């Protein structure tokens, strides 16, 4: 369906009490405006015109990669004025969809319904029934059809009783919309050019106005302050959780789950409370994610258990692995099948081979570890000399004793043993035992220091 979209995003957002433009505040880890842009892109919008004003430099920096035409509204003179700034870009015969950068949950299904409902030469208008319509423009009907919209400040006491409200979202043909916008005036309580006045202009020309309701009322709720943003966050997360439950993912507490990206799950996955998913995450079959974990841009294969409070970012984890609790896998970390990392272990840009283990208090950076190797508690790969990074290579069936420092670049061949407390600076041959401790001394009669009085 051929259409273009105008997204109004010029408002300052005073009630957010922030130096950041309102539409850049995030919902589910993504700027509100980007939610709307992504929905339009997914529907195949030919053009997306983003009308901006306050914080323009910040807007353009944050959304630099988005496929939008930037339209400046230098003075905020109302919604009609905002849309009119983009009107020179409208094609006369295309459908033009008007959306809002601070209404992030509008769904593709609702937009499709609205586009389909537009009468020839007329307007399709998204309206919603509200028990408490305070602050919203009211829909005025005459013997059924919509004939006008009256803003809250312009409404009579009788009109204020109307529960059908304007969402501001509409579809009109480009040529008609340009003509109606050109005829707007600002003779109202706000001294602004209201987009809503195009409804009366269309009616005066005998054009039909078709009202459409959203699939869910929450879709058309806007954000003016942080409390409203928090409400939409929870509503969005609830919808995400419901979809995952319907797909067979066991969320132990759907109310305490946050999806801030994309999640693909195999069969019989289980996710405990307070887990946060960011970026693109893939879970295989029978994966268990413990409470309080954060997963970002990672892949976790079948039958792996991630114990509570682990952080995995930019990493790949094989089958039958165990991670955590309190493990951090940083970008470039790779765990091969049946490997294990435990509490307070950090892995960065390192590969842990099949069947290998680092169960306690360890840092593995810029390292390659073979199969069936055991890394003792307190082991550190010393990969950085203050200027450059160096690699540690550890072979198969190696045993590294506790509290060892492996000063890279260094290679430990298959079957070698590193004694506890070793500071290793030279390569180790296959099967060798290395111990670098000083000779043990015993001092009899030694007295501990005492505090001076």
Curated annotation (Swiss-Prot):
InterPro entries associated with the record: Bifunctional_GlmU, GlmU-like, GlmU_C_LbH, Hexapep, Hexapep_transf_CS, MobA-like_NTP_Trfase, Nucleotide-diphossugar_trans, Trimer_LpxA-like_sf
Stored SUPFAM superfamilies: Nucleotide-diphospho-sugar transferases, Trimeric LpxA-like enzymes
Coiled-coil intervals, chain numbering: none
Membership in a protein family: In the N-terminal section; belongs to the N-acetylglucosamine-1-phosphate uridyltransferase family. In the C-terminal section; belongs to the transferase hexapeptide repeat family.
Source species of the chain: Vibrio campbellii (strain ATCC BAA-1116)
Record region (Pyrophosphorylase): 1-226
GO cellular component terms attached to this protein's record: cytoplasm; membrane
Residues annotated as binding acetyl-CoA: 377, 383-384, 402, 420, 437
Protein name (record): Bifunctional protein GlmU
Function: Catalyzes the last two sequential reactions in the de novo biosynthetic pathway for UDP-N-acetylglucosamine (UDP-GlcNAc). The C-terminal domain catalyzes the transfer of acetyl group from acetyl coenzyme A to glucosamine-1-phosphate (GlcN-1-P) to produce N-acetylglucosamine-1-phosphate (GlcNAc-1-P), which is converted into UDP-GlcNAc by the transfer of uridine 5-monophosphate (from uridine 5-triphosphate), a reaction catalyzed by the N-terminal domain.
